[in-house]
Amino acid sequence: HVSSMAGGFADWKRNGYDFELPRALSPEQRSRYSRHILIPEVGEEGQQRLLDARVLLIGAGGLGSPASLYLAAAGVGTLGIVDADIVDDSNLQRQIVHSTNTLGEPKVLSAKRAIEALNPDVTVVPYEERLTSENVERILADGWDVIVDGADNFPTRYLVNDASVWHHIPVVHGSIYRFEGQVTVFHPHAGPCYRCLYPSPPPPELAPSCAEGGVLG
């Protein structure tokens, strides 16, 4: 059955058919994101897609901190943050989303406050818990377009990998050790996954934590 458009949009609307009004950026958003909009590959349509995007960050530490701020500044509309830690003074040398004023606070709430102060367009969904096999399905069920993996341990990285493959969610994976850093994008079913490259974690002595081996701020 094909409905008639005779009578135009007014009749279509009056008859109760579905419709969607075109969305436009507000004047404030056009000003805030003007440097994005000037890029032909982005424009207003691309900026609207960023505002509609949902990104889940695993960790609000040395990797998650700058990632969260730049994603928020870019106008990614919804950021989920998973972290069970609290802000410690040893974090402040590199975890720039936190501050002296938030020492002792849960990292997810400290990050939420900073992100919302930076860009009120962004909604922050805090998960004050460590990602585990018991909660990963619940968290991913909230619907995420991309996962940013800034975890500081291998069990979590493998868990993120396995869940992302199952749910077909791309993962941006970051890691750092002292002066070295790595960034990799894993797109499930479009290329190899993290476990494909590293079937098992390295022995602990080859992968010390930041607390054990240090890290540049």
Features from the language model and the residues they span:
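Adenine nucleotide-associated cytosolic modules
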Residues: 1, 6-217
